Design a protein with these regions (language model features):
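Expand to "…catalyze enediolate/carbanion chemistry for C-C bond making/breaking, isomerization
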Residues: 1-269
């Protein structure tokens, strides 16, 4: 199953790590970066390495200490992948070398102007299977003051969606929603991300997971409509008209197949 939700868990909080797998996230990210104070980085590496002996998680490393972070976790059986913050080609190349022959995928977070400048190189880097956005860091570096709908960042979101598709990656992962108690706004902004081409979102608290998962799960009505669309074209001559009077061609069917693939992937988990 392709994850719809990724839950960040502070790497130095063993109790939270141990309980996180039961909170409803499609994937966990054991965080060695922002969620951990500098003084606790060593303890966090030890705690995450211990967790990965029996549990499964992605690990977000630090951009300035990739060697130390990967030395602690790269050989643990539960390492699902590495989240690279502030992703730029040079850092991704360094991570690739450090991982060596290990078959470890990478989720690259776009959080810097330089990373955006080299967006397609980031998307095409070895090991990268998915892109994500760190909009707080980007807004700070670009001197943006985003409004409630964050329109100021929409061009960047579109660029990340295009780069992902062009490189054959999974659809990208949306940024965290920092108003942790406002689940209504979380739903609204996650639906916006869905329309913009994202198919997952990161979370910073378990209470956000049900909302995120629901938005990225095709409804029964959507699945039924998608099946009808695919069947309509398969029985026609390349172009057809559906019950609503809408022209159906291969481009429309491609979107319908994407809905069905997401639904079937969830049923297989």
């Amino acid at each position: 199953m392709t994850p719809r939700s990724y839950l960040y868990v502070p790497g130095d909080q063993s109790r939270l790590l141990d309980g996180a797998a039961r909170r409803g996230a499609d994937a966990l990210i054991a965080d060695l970066e922002d969620a951990v104070a500098v003084a606790n980085k060593g303890a966090a590496r030890t705690a995450v390495a211990s967790y990965l002996d029996t549990g499964t998680a992605w690990v977000r490393i630090n951009a300035d200490t990739p060697a130390d972070d990967l030395a602690a976790v790269a050989d643990r059986p539960g390492l699902a992948g590495v989240v690279v913050p502030k992703a730029e080609p040079a850092l991704l190349s360094e991570v690739d070398v450090l991982l060596g022959s290990r078959r470890v995928p990478v989720l690259a977070l776009l959080e810097t102007a330089r990373g955006l400048r080299h967006l397609h190189a980031v998307a095409e880097s070895p090991r990268v299977v998915r892109l994500g956005l760190g909009e707080a860091d980007l807004a700070g570096e670009l001197n943006l003051r985003p409004g409630p709908d964050r329109e100021e960042l929409w061009p960047i979101r579109s660029a990340v969606v295009v780069a992902s598709a062009a490189a054959g990656l999974l659809p990208p992962v949306g940024p965290v929603h920092t108003a942790v108690r406002d689940l209504s706004d979380l739903e609204r902004t996650t639906e916006l991300l869905l329309r913009q081409g994202f198919r997952a979102r990161t979370a910073i608290t378990p209470t956000q997971l049900a909302t995120i998962n629901a938005v990225f799960t095709p409804s029964a009505e959507e699945v039924e409509k998608a099946r009808a669309t695919v069947a309509l074209l398969s029985s026609g001559t390349g172009v057809a008209v559906d019950a609503d009077g809408r022209m159906v061609d291969e481009a429309v069917v491609r979107s319908a197949r994407e809905v069905l693939a997401r639904s079937e992937g969830l049923q297989e988990q």
